[in-house]
Swiss-Prot record:
Name of protein: Small ribosomal subunit protein eS25B
Residue(s) carrying N,N-dimethylproline: 2
Organism: Saccharomyces cerevisiae (strain ATCC 204508 / S288c) (Baker's yeast)
GO molecular function terms attached to this record: structural constituent of ribosome
Other information: It is presumed that the precursor part of S25 is engaged in assembling of the small subunit, thus being essential in ribosome maturation.
Functional note: Component of the ribosome, a large ribonucleoprotein complex responsible for the synthesis of proteins in the cell. The small ribosomal subunit (SSU) binds messenger RNAs (mRNAs) and translates the encoded message by selecting cognate aminoacyl-transfer RNA (tRNA) molecules. The large subunit (LSU) contains the ribosomal catalytic site termed the peptidyl transferase center (PTC), which catalyzes the formation of peptide bonds, thereby polymerizing the amino acids delivered by tRNAs into a polypeptide chain.
Pfam families attached to this UniProt entry: Ribosomal_S25
UniProt-annotated location(s): Cytoplasm
GO biological process per UniProt: cytoplasmic translation
Top-level taxon of the source organism: Eukaryota
């Protein structure tokens, strides 16, 4: 078997650049979603807004209150219990993970 031919440094560099290997995938930089700045303490303004707006909703749940009123989940659960106790909303389905309510005047 004849000996291998020695390549110059320039030839080796050119062979390396010629490729054959796939270039690595560049991960696209997606825009990061901003952290939600929901209220965690209920002030009078939010309380009045809950009493005014929630009875008009046909479907009321924790996630609806969090989205529309920009309050935290724990505040939304407390508000729903308070509104149910006052008779403003009535439960449709109560589950350990998700409670669903509707306005009390809808069925009357």
């Amino acid at each position: 078997m004849p000996p291998k031919q020695q390549l110059s440094k320039a030839a080796k560099a050119a062979a390396a650049l010629a490729g054959g290997k796939k270039s690595k995938k560049k991960w696209s930089k997606k825009s990061m979603k901003d952290r939600a700045q929901h209220a965690v303490i209920l002030d009078q303004e939010k309380y009045d807004r809950i009493l005014k707006e929630v009875p008009t909703y046909r479907y009321v749940s924790v996630s609806v209150l969090v989205d529309r009123l920009k309050i935290g989940g724990s505040l939304a659960r407390i508000a729903l219990r308070h509104l149910e106790k006052e008779g403003i909303i009535k439960p449709i389905s109560k589950h350990s993970k998700q409670a669903i309510y509707t306005r009390a005047a809808a069925s009357e």
